[in-house]
């Protein structure tokens, strides 16, 4: 039946390290919370203090997320009212831009499709998390929606972003729209 159940455990908290080996199914029947990291944690057999520190921070955030204390999928984002209101406002503005781009250039790969492919589960934060990951925002800190947006802007390549201008100014043809979306 499993050691934990035999010793009287009433619930399990399991951490998936995505390590090499055999993963046995949980047949205990106990309520189980599974903690997984979105991020690559590195070689667990090679001890490096900086990597260990980073993994401890990420693991702490993953645990808080698993128990509903944080939002986000890739980034640890505050779940309080202010940060959640900012996430909802960001999502509404993002959706309006998405709609405008789809209407002008229907063949453009839109972010809603890309986000499905990225498997980011928090719909309001997914666009912000995806771009933050794309530019290399550090996943270890604790963020609010606003501070994650600011971290994204600090790492942003504004030259790359300027290529998207024609999508919003109505000057781009379908080929230029597709090129901008892929860059």
Model-derived features with residue positions:
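Patatin-like phospholipase
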Residues: 1-183
């Amino acid at each position: 039946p499993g050691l934990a159940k035999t010793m009287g455990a009433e619930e399990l908290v399991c951490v998936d390290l995505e390590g090499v080996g055999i993963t046995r199914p949980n047949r205990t029947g106990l309520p189980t919370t599974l903690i997984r990291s979105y991020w690559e944690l590195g070689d667990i057999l090679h001890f490096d203090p900086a990597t260990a520190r980073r993994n401890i921070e990420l693991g702490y955030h993953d645990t808080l997320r698993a128990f509903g204390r944080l939002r986000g999928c890739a980034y640890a984002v505050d779940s309080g009212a202010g940060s959640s209101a900012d996430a909802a406002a960001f999502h509404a503005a993002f959706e309006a831009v998405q709609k405008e781009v789809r209407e002008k250039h229907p063949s453009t790969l839109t972010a809603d499709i890309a986000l499905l492919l990225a498997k980011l589960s928090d719909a309001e934060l997914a666009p912000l998390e995806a771009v933050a990951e794309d530019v290399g925002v550090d996943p270890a800190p604790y963020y609010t929606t606003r501070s994650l947006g600011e971290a994204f802007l600090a790492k942003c390549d504004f030259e790359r972003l300027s290529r998207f201008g024609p999508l919003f100014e109505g000057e781009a043809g379908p080929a230029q729209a597709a090129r901008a979306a892929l860059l």
